[in-house]
A protein has these predicted regions:
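N-terminal accessory scaffold of Fe(II)-dependent oxygenases
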Residues: 1-218, 228-306
Length: 306
């Protein structure tokens, strides 16, 4: 029952980290908690920074387009090498792209042991599942407003700056929630940074916490609190996320996980679109010594699970 309890005070707590036990006691209040973490784990910030993508540029990351969240029910991501994703976001002038859910990227690079070293300071007792993530985005890009059902979720800023909007669970009646079991994401259909006319009336009824998080600080996001991140003007903003699921939390999530795995068994892959890339193939004809410029159009397949 405790896993389903929420706190509704529109207030962010600030604390001085002393030890893991005290952190867990404060987090059990289920309010957002902001604390300085650089002084506790300085190597975490020294070793994960704006170069973390460029130094591992051959490994793939998942890139999303925020516009997909407001165009339909299906959310597709594109897998790109880290170098290509970085260039895409640096040249994106419309603030559309961000990358997240990069567990594979972390596991396939030397970043995993750096994340793992934080468990001593952050991990609650009886945790069964631990997830690590690294995120960045185009200048002024945002993530959708959503909530999670994990036991603990910590985000931390390593470079640049983010602005975050948060609102408690009771706001859900105005947020048009969508439970997406295909991607296991519980989100709002409202863009809280730029609401459209259709949702303007409901948006005006909402109250938000809105504050900046600077490098060296970490935020505990309680379960069932709605939150959305806006990346700073600096395209080198790096944010990490560490999530823990306790035994009882796993039990409470079984119905949702069951729906997720059922959805996965009912999906099949189809080709959604192809990107024609026109290449000029210069072939020299030995007999005529003329160049045959034949346009070649290979197709790059992008897939979507439905």
């Amino acid at each position: 029952i405790n896993q389903l309890k929420t706190s509704e005070d529109l207030e962010v707590y600030e604390m001085d980290y002393t030890n893991n036990q005290y952190l867990q006691e404060v987090c059990n209040i289920k309010q957002p908690v902001l604390f300085n973490y650089d002084s506790i784990s300085p190597e975490f910030y020294e070793q994960i920074n704006a170069n973390s993508f460029t130094s591992n540029n051959n490994h793939d990351v998942k890139v999303k387009d925020i516009r997909d969240y407001y165009k339909g029910e299906s959310i597709d991501y594109i897998v790109l090498p880290a170098s290509s994703a970085t260039n895409l976001m640096k040249t994106d002038t419309r603030s559309n792209y961000f990358t997240e859910n990069n567990e594979d990227f972390i596991e396939n690079t030397d970043l995993y042991h750096i994340f793992h070293s934080n468990d001593t300071h952050l991990k609650p007792q009886l945790s069964m599942i631990t997830k690590y993530d690294i995120m960045t985005g185009s200048s002024k890009s945002v993530t959708p407003l959503r909530y999670h059902t994990d036991f603990r979720k910590f985000i931390s800023v390593h470079s640049g700056k983010i602005k975050i909007k948060m609102t408690p669970w009771k706001s859900h009646k105005y947020l048009h929630p969508h439970r997406d079991f295909e991607n296991y994401e519980f989100r709002s259909r409202i863009n809280v940074w730029n609401p459209d006319k259709q949702h303007k009336n409901d948006f005006d009824k909402l109250r938000f916490l809105e504050f900046d998080i600077t490098p060296g600080n970490a935020l505990h996001i309680p379960p069932y609190w709605w939150y959305s991140i806006q990346f700073n003007d600096d395209s080198d903003t790096i944010v990490t996320s560490i999530t823990y699921n306790s035994v009882m939390n796993c039990v409470s999530n079984l119905p949702n996980w069951g729906m997720y795995y059922l959805q996965q068994t009912n999906t099949k892959t189809k080709i959604t679109k192809t990107l024609p890339i026109e290449i000029t193939n210069e072939e020299v004809d030995d007999n005529s010594n003329k160049i045959d410029e034949t346009p070649v159009q290979p197709e790059v397949e992008m897939t979507q699970e439905i």
